[in-house]
A protein has these predicted regions:
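Enzyme catalytic cores with a strong preference for nitrogen-chemistry domains
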Residues: 1-172
């Protein structure tokens, strides 16, 4: 938990092994780079910056892979978002923030994270590059497949984001 460097190293090993075995899409869990269970550590700027630095390094060091999705927290406009970063060939293709933030039973993500519904921009700057940012992004993979992304609770609602993503052309 909160050991971003260790999580990064494990992710790099996984991508190498999976790429060598022929995987064309590698997906890591929600908030993988920090771990999901950081609690109030998500309020620490050092953790958020460490995750962003790890994402930049991860994208560069996995340039040989087809497509990778990894979870991390991203701060934008004074809000913190639970996001999935889509990487391909060394580039960060886009950042998808979670839309439905659970706040019941053992889930209390609203303590730390904002919904993508609060997003009032279409991009973020990462490593001096403008990167698309939004819950409605579609990504065309090298195979030609079109990918849409939703995160955990997003799938559990009556009309999940994937419904609109599919209507707009997502295959995966």
């Amino acid at each position: 938990v909160a050991n971003v460097e260790k999580n990064l190293q494990n992710a790099l090993k996984t991508v190498k092994a999976e790429s060598e075995s022929g995987s064309s899409l590698i997906v890591f869990p929600e908030l993988y780079l920090t771990a999901y269970t950081c609690g109030d550590l998500f309020l620490q700027d050092a953790l958020i910056q460490s995750a962003l630095d790890a994402l930049i390094k991860f994208s560069k060091e996995t340039a040989y892979s087809d497509a990778v999705i990894v979870g991390l927290p991203i701060k934008k406009g004074g809000e913190l978002y639970n996001c999935a970063a889509v990487l391909q060939s060394g580039a960060i293709l886009g950042i998808v923030p979670k839309t439905y933030i659970p706040n019941y039973n053992e889930y209390y993500e609203k303590r730390w994270f904002a919904s993508s519904e609060k997003v009032n921009c279409s991009s973020v700057i990462i490593d001096d590059e403008e990167v698309p940012f939004g819950s409605n992004l579609l990504f065309t993979l090298s195979s030609g497949a079109v990918l849409g992304v939703e995160i955990c609770e997003d799938l559990w609602v009556p009309v999940p984001p994937s419904s609109e993503l599919c209507l707009n052309g997502a295959d995966i």
